[in-house]
Design a protein with these regions (language model features):
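Extended, highly charged
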Residues: 1-185
Length: 185
């Protein structure tokens, strides 16, 4: 229903203004693009990854944002999932089947497509909070963080895949997951 009277109109305008301010901004000259390592030069062994448990197969990314996109709708998902280094060029991602990234992977598999994935490491804690908070699927984690911060998140386009990442990320990893590609974690 439309707002009735000045008070309701003012409250509606305030919410609309907050939403407008919270929209993500695109950064054309992002700090995360200052140093780019090509795929052939990539060695994940150079990343400062922790081994959380002595029997773990390799180091793990802690508090990295995992960014995927629904292959049908293009709606992004940002989550915090366990990422473990398996080799100099590969990592595993461990997500629960009910989470957004896992849903995107199932859809990509049904379409016989690879799922593009980006990992943003060294981001503002507010972005980690937004990614870890259960919010409705229709609400973007970027918009949620912007609403909380009172200003839009600064994003930039990835170099090799069609995803956006926080432009002030310290490290961005870009890659893809092939349907059916599974490894022990």
């Amino acid at each position: 229903r439309p707002p009735k009277g000045f008070k309701e109109t003012k409250a509606f305008a305030s919410v609309a203004w907050d939403l407008l301010k919270a929209r993500p901004d695109i950064d054309l000259m992002p700090p995360c693009h200052q140093k780019v390592t090509r795929e052939e030069d990539l060695d994940l062994n150079h990343l400062p990854l922790l081994r959380p448990w002595p029997e773990d197969a390799g180091g793990a990314v802690t508090l990295g944002l995992v960014i995927t996109k629904d292959p049908e709708t293009g709606v992004p998902n940002v989550g915090v999932y366990r990422l473990q280094r398996q080799s100099a060029k590969t990592m595993t991602v461990h997500w629960l089947s009910v989470r957004g990234g896992a849903r995107h992977l199932r859809k990509a598999a049904a379409m016989k497509k690879k799922l593009e994935i980006a990992v943003a490491i060294g981001v503002h804690p507010l972005l980690v909070m937004a990614a870890a908070t259960p919010i409705p699927v229709q609400l973007s984690e970027w918009l949620f963080a912007g609403l909380y911060a009172g200003e839009g998140v600064r994003l930039t386009k990835c170099k090799t895949i069609d995803l956006q990442v926080p432009s002030h990320s310290e490290i961005v990893l870009e890659g893809s997951i092939s349907p059916g590609e599974e490894m022990m974690d």
